[in-house]
């Protein structure tokens, strides 16, 4: 199979974690079994990601607090502190859906081989570009979006990888996902502009004499008051904290996804799969593979040529160097079923087997996504396929609690510093 693991895997530990709290213990356990250089690489990579989130925090602070500070609805320091707290809560409670939506902009070949030198170079290139641009725009006071920056760096890495590996640019980036996210980034400000403008026009028409239309200077000159009316002030404060919370749940997840890429690249044995998965979750994954095989055979008339069902069969073998090819789907399913047969705990699998299982799952999910876009597949079957994809990835799309807390702290503290 393709190269596995990271340098230093299996060496005796040169970095011994001290005993600590239950939350920090899993984080410090990272370094057990790693030699000094691999441990330092891990520290450097994690520092890069957390630095990106820290910069993201102070870079985007103004988005949430500018209105409440300008209108005197809140004192500046209190507004920034509360914004940081709500950013922190947004990361903690936001889940990991956005995290993996961003990660899957990368081509599947890079994702299944992220534990190689090229995969690690990809992560450092993305982070270096995003950090440099965010710092530069912040320093010169240029409005910029951290999300646009990160997505642009991901697309750049995907295209560079396509050029280096002699594959077409069409395959070098997950363009379907890129278009979806790009449309969201374009539509969001337009929708915000239209909704906000519409509400303003309605309020000006229905309540033309309301105090809410006065600027802070006008209110101070006319009413000798510096704060907005109570209800307007309450709405401003709630909306600012809501923006902070949503920013945390959205932008914070990007950091979670990046940290998971780093962990999978440097210490793959511990993070390629969620080793805390329950027996039920593993059974769901194994059953999804069986149902996926049945699904493809059930729709052989539509999918037979794309998946090479007539030639592949369950008896075919995978090539020695694994690659994600739709025509190897049935052998991939067979290999996955063989690796998971009788498994009730991922910890029982060897490190190499866990890496293989992740590769198979990511490849099958990517192929299923392509199958769902084919013409001739009934809507009901597409819905079934989508559910199977969710079951396949339930133990690969996750994040440990310490990762979420670390990103939440970096983003929240960065917001307060901003």
For each feature predicted by the language model, list its residue ranges:
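Low-complexity, proline/glycine-enriched hydrophobic segments characteristic of transmembrane helices
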Residues: 1-7, 11-27, 268-402
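Interfacial segments of multi-pass membrane proteins
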Residues: 67-75, 152-164, 261-267
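Glycine-rich, mobile lid/loop segments that gate access to catalytic sites or pores
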Residues: 143, 151, 155, 159, ...
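Transmembrane alpha-helical segments of multi-pass membrane transport proteins and ion-pumping complexes
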Residues: 46, 50-61, 87-100, 126, ...
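Residue-level signal for short hydrophobic patches within transmembrane helices
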Residues: 40, 44-55, 82-85, 238-249
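Membrane-interface alpha-helices at helix entry/exit sites of multi-pass transporters
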Residues: 72-84
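Structural signature of hydrophobic alpha-helical transmembrane segments
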Residues: 39, 43-46, 50, 115-127, ...
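Anion-binding (especially nucleotide phosphate/pyrophosphate-binding) glycine-rich loop
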Residues: 33-34, 48, 96-138, 142-144, ...
